[in-house]
């Protein structure tokens, strides 16, 4: 089997980190990047220096010309095209396109990439109509005739594996999720206008900001047996990366907190290895920066009121973990061909 050739549309936080994951993978080849809003030389700077994940040190990065980046000896074609259907992915050899602009998140808009020669599109955000897949949870439902998929959200990727383990072992009656979530690019540095979400317009680094999230309801899309049983909300907090899910659920089959811990530990060492983590150390958020797993269960942080009512805590690097799953989903699609 040859390498999996990918292109990235939108060189923002997720786009750049997916590029980092791809460039460190033996089986994946980054062949093209499209972003109409930044020049190629600025692209090299933004890729090389990262406040959260540190400087890129795996290969030299240089400008070959205005349309080509060099990662070591590896050339990557650069486009600056606004309209997705005009991006010549086929010419660049990109078969799988990561749609990470945050703009083209529905099937019709994402399908524009197919016109330029892409074979499959992975949307790095939730989608209202593209099928959503969470690696470790429902990627086995993917069939090769599906050309446009969503990798759901970073929070759904954290919550769904945890919810799956609990539901498979103990049965979830109902639950509420809160994610304590790091700042993201859409927030404001100082108080500013945000017509749809007034609180969201307040200064990100000075406030704890309650916000809505569809992440818990989306679990019902990837695990239909939990449809209508979970909902949740978010607090945006003044940290720059790493978030944490608090899942409070009622369970059918009574179990002690120790038994619940055992079930999660077994999953983290077995079927969900590399997706679900398990820690018993006294860790804090920065300890999870750069963790490639989707969901790291904090055994010491959770509590049980009784054998049927429990609160579970699970960490995630909402940037790096998620970007790794985007590439994992592409790998799975490639194998399914």
Swiss-Prot record:
Expression sites (tissue/organ): Developing seeds, seedling roots and shoots, and embryo.
Residues passing through the membrane, by range: none
Catalytic residues as annotated in Swiss-Prot or TrEMBL: 154 (nucleophile)
Region (Catalytic) location: 152-337
GO cellular component, as recorded: cytosol; protein-containing complex
Cited InterPro entries: GlycerAld/Erythrose_P_DH, GlycerAld_3-P_DH_AS, GlycerAld_3-P_DH_cat, GlycerAld_3-P_DH_NAD(P)-bd, Glyceraldehyde-3-P_DH_1, NAD(P)-bd_dom_sf
Location of the protein in the cell: Cytoplasm
Note: Plants contain two types of GAPDH: cytosolic forms which participate in glycolysis and chloroplast forms which participate in photosynthesis. All the forms are encoded by distinct genes.
PANTHER family (alphabetical): GLYCERALDEHYDE 3-PHOSPHATE DEHYDROGENASE, GLYCERALDEHYDE-3-PHOSPHATE DEHYDROGENASE 1, CYTOSOLIC
Family in the record: Belongs to the glyceraldehyde-3-phosphate dehydrogenase family.
Protein name: Glyceraldehyde-3-phosphate dehydrogenase 2, cytosolic
Originating species: Zea mays (Maize)
